Amino acid sequence: MTTTVKCPTCQKEVIWNSESKFKPFCSDRCKLIDLGDWASEKHAIPVKSEFDPETLDGLGYDEADFFKDQ
């Protein structure tokens, strides 16, 4: 059975095998369009910020001598 996927850029059907030169894209053009979208920040991977300013305030990071050696 042949597996096919849709090109992420143009939605054209692409055969998914080791001989598919540009997979998951149908062509070098579609691959470069996608790369340009990432470079211009049209695409982004959502992340949850681990930095919470309120938590730091509660820990005393705003104290002037917090980072001084004891």
From Swiss-Prot:
Keywords: Metal-binding, Zinc. Binds 1 zinc ion. One of its GO terms (molecular function) is DNA topoisomerase type II (double strand cut, ATP-hydrolyzing) inhibitor activity. The keyword tRNA-binding does not apply. The keyword Cytoplasm does not apply. Its cofactor is Zn(2+). Inhibits all the catalytic activities of DNA gyrase by preventing its interaction with DNA. Acts by binding directly to the C-terminal domain of GyrB, which probably disrupts DNA binding by the gyrase. Belongs to the DNA gyrase inhibitor YacG family. Interacts with GyrB. This is DNA gyrase inhibitor YacG. It comes from Shewanella sediminis (strain HAW-EB3). The gene is yacG.
